[in-house]
Amino acid sequence: RIDEWQQYPDTVDGKPTKWTPHNANGTFSGAAMPLKSAFAQSINSVAVKLGYELGIHNVAQTAHAMGIESPLHETPSLSLGSSDVNLLELVNGYCTVIDDGKMNPPILITKILDRDGNIIYAAEPEEQQAIPYRSAFFMQRLLRGGLTEPGGTTAALWSYIHPVLKYTDFGGKTGTSNNHSDAWFVGVTPKLVAGGWVGGEYRSIHFRTGALGQGSRTALPIFGNFIQKVLLDDRFAQYRAKFPKKPLEDIDPTTYTCESYYAPQEPDSLTAPTDSLGIALPGDSLQRGNASPEKQPEAKTETTASEGSGNHPQASHTAP
């Protein structure tokens, strides 16, 4: 797909309008790029175009099937994360991807034992295949591309994970609101998914610039420090794992082994309707805002971890 300027019909307060997605640097390269590269670099124009091609309603329905329970506004910017969801929902959606498309609602209490070790309560997982294995496999490759693709917005994670790379694979995705008030990062391994959010109680509380407030600068280190400590601790050796080298189903290798040939070094994308000037500021990804495009020339932190046990993820939620 081509990274280019586009307009999409939208509705604001019941009135028809047009909305244009912007990239983090406020420009469009005009280059055709593989989806793997566009995802890794958080190219907003490509994400919105893909969402339109798939159908915004279909995007919303799939998100709900994967574990998102919050209302989703079916506008073009939904592809960039414009609707509010909580961190636990977000992490659970990523768990669905890592569990090969199987969605398990979060379980707070897995079991209760009496003083003699007898089980008096055991949670019963409610697993369902939310998306096809093929789709989950492709998403796993995209998430890993944030680390391996040139210009990937997850590159900063290397400094945290290099001691454990010999026995664990990683992936992840950043996100930042357009005024730098909210920053996100969700990191994945084959056995553990965790997310971090940095923001204020009110969106008037925000970082001054994207360079300071983007997800790769604020939320990514939360995951990085957490996952490093977990995987270096032999008590949690069960979380060390590698992704399969080949898919479990017959999938044409040419559909997921393409390498990037165009990789501008740019900061992550922004979430926006638009800013006050109608352009995007330096930052990361999310956005707001279905119809055919018209082409023309005080901070708080939260962490959520979900255990991808292969069958039934378990989740914990803390708000330091």
Spans of features found by a protein language model:
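Conserved catalytic neighborhood of penicillin-recognizing serine enzymes
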Residues: 1-59, 103, 115-144
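Long, low-complexity, intrinsically disordered segments
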Residues: 294-320
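Extended, hydrophobic alpha-helical segments in both membrane/secreted and soluble proteins
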Residues: 1, 46-47, 59, 76, ...
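Primarily short, surface-exposed interaction patches in extracytoplasmic proteins
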Residues: 53, 57-90, 115-121
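A penicillin-recognizing enzyme superfamily signal
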Residues: 37-41, 86-262, 266-275
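Ligand-recognition elements built from short beta-strands and adjacent flexible loops
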Residues: 280, 284-295, 299
